[in-house]
Amino acid sequence: MKRTTLSLFAGAAALAAVTGFAAVSAPGDTGAETVEPAARLPVERTSLLCPAPSASDLAETTYTSFTPVTEGAEEKGTATLTAAADGAGAEAGKGGEDAESGKDGEDAKDGEEGKDGKDGKDGEPVLRPGAPGTPVTGTASGADAPALTGTAEGSHAPGWTVQQTTEVAAGTGRGLLGLNCTAPDTEFWFPGASTASGRTDYVHLTNPDDSAAVVDIELYGKDGVLKSTVGEGVTVPPGGGESLLLSTLTDVEQTDVTVHVNVRSGRLGAAVQALDDKTGGDWLTAAADPAGELVVPGIPADATAVRLMLFTPGGSDADLKVRLASPSGAITPAGHETVHVKAGMTTGVDLGEVTRGEAGSLVLTPTSGSVPVVAAVRVVRGEGGEQESAFIPASDPVGARATAAENRAKGTTLSVTAPDRTAKVEVTASAGTEGGTTATKTFTIEGGTTQNVEVPVPAGLKGTYALTVETVSGGPVYAARTLTGEDEDVASFTVQPLPDDRGTVSVPKAEQNLSVLQQPPA
């Protein structure tokens, strides 16, 4: 997002410099022109990347694609989601052989086995998205489903969202695993990973481009960096999807690990698949960029255990206030009023049953000076042998609009929080994949609270549907959507934060002024 955003702004600035100018004058200038607000225009192209869903033969995966209707978007467009190129273990300097022939090599066959899968075979799209406003689904079975790369253009681009949901009936990582497929970027932070016994965590890398990408993978534990040369200079082939087992990158067992993925050349999609022998598994997606204030939205009301993981990448320690935004207001968890995060070290804090049967979101703010941190929580639901876990990273706000592609008539919970000011949001349910008409509701979220809102359901719903959340006034607001499994005897679930869906971009207001090209040199 960093490189793409900077390029976009640079291009807009260059365009303004050549064909016009945004009126900017110092205070007191005579003849100063009024600065007009930037216009928000629909994007014309969107790329998304989905990791290989599972190495389990029991895996059943559903992909749901949805583009919301966006005012001002082009009338025509296309979108496709196809299998990434074959891959059998990332190449990494001296560690390349180990990454290919060890345990990771065996389990990183997703890309290679994709050749024989019924979905994406011979370059055929896994699904072909329909018109904006109606979600479309595709499926894959077993361990041979590959990573996917997708591109949407024209009318299909603004806010294009793809949800990948996998159900695994048994074994390590059983349960419900879900994520929103991500846009390519150049840097990712994953607090919440682990190299402890009983955990099997992989970092998945997907390259959308026609040239190889080179990436460094750094691990940080409770005492600082976990030294390893295996994660340096990992090469991901053009259009390929790869996975690396974290325990092959270091021989140190750590309960809480922060993974830093830094792309030297090219761009990638990245996600961590965290599988637990006892509490199932889920995807750990990238946390919001390091910041002094963070929000972790949508902790389930019936969570039986919540563990907060934090990391500060700078050279200064961070001290943070910990608050839970509940339906009745901000609450300070007993015994965890503040947390101290040492520079370059991962800190884990057990918050227990912090939500106590109510909707909740964690709000982290500095006690004094602001120091950038990243954060995520691991949530456990259920009791005994029926427990399952999921991860919620700190998120960016909803912004203009956020989108959740896959929702069901039962088992969908939408959590919305306004950590500071009261906000009004509009929630719209799309038509269903097999039928139904849209429905909309508006909610007011009081400042400092979190509400599990009563989501609208399409009239005559058949299949699954999409939700959009739009900020009407106030805010900022943060949101997360929880899906629960259909088997009521097992606490399977997955949570996806809902940041802005990148459907529109701010373009400075410019006016024609060719005289800037005729001014004599200084």
Locations of the language-model features?
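Hydrophobic alpha-helical membrane segments, chiefly transmembrane helices and signal peptide h-regions
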Residues: L6-A26, V259, R267-A270, L324, ...
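Long, internal scaffold/assembly segments composed of regular secondary structure
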Residues: Q273, G280, A286-V371
